[in-house]
A protein has these predicted regions:
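Active-site-proximal beta-alpha core segment in soluble small-molecule metabolic enzymes
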Residues: 3, 8-10, 15, 31-163
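Glycine-rich phosphate/diphosphate-binding loops that line cofactor/substrate pockets in enzymes
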Residues: 20-31
């Protein structure tokens, strides 16, 4: 009979806090930390970990889609939650849960702008991964478009850096 061993990973919240404090100590005082919590924290208790990170002083959380963001918000997380792939069909849920969105093309920029609702946005540029993101030469057009939609609140410029 073959013995099957389970793989178990436990997150030590005290060490998580210690690591956060250490990393924060290496940054300039006003630097904000955004914790990536994609895939429901890979099964490690997304709501529990998100609340702990919020307690430690993380500025915002980054998740893959609106379902993850909505779950965290409904679980009581108050800090900004950034949706990496907001899509086009989840706008109501995103607005209702006050979720931030990453805008990586003109279709999304126009869609969220035309909703005429206050939405915090993060503009993503392609810096070599060639997956999602505006090209650098589109920056002026993006800026002009954002001015056209004053209810879109620019929070950051971001990218997924290529190794």
């Amino acid at each position: 009979m073959e013995i099957i061993h389970e793989t178990i990973l436990e997150v030590d919240v005290n060490r998580l806090k210690s690591n956060f404090i250490y990393l924060k100590s290496k940054l300039k005082e006003k630097t904000k930390i955004i914790a990536v919590m994609k895939a429901y924290a890979y099964g490690h208790g997304d709501i529990i970990l998100a609340k702990k990170l919020e307690e430690f002083g993380v500025h915002a959380l980054w998740v893959a889609d609106f379902e993850e963001g909505s779950r965290l918000r409904e679980g009581g997380v108050q800090i900004p939650i950034i949706i990496a792939n907001p899509g086009t069909k989840s706008t109501k849920k995103i607005i209702d849960n006050k979720l931030d969105v990453v805008i990586y093309n003109f279709k999304l920029l126009q869609l969220y702008g035309e909703l005429n609702k206050e939405i915090c946005v993060h503009i993503k540029f392609n810096t070599g991964m060639n997956r999602y993101g505006f090209n650098a030469d589109e920056a002026k057009i993006i800026a002009k478009t954002l001015l056209k939609y004053p209810k879109l609140k620019l929070q950051s410029i971001c990218s997924h850096l290529a190794a």
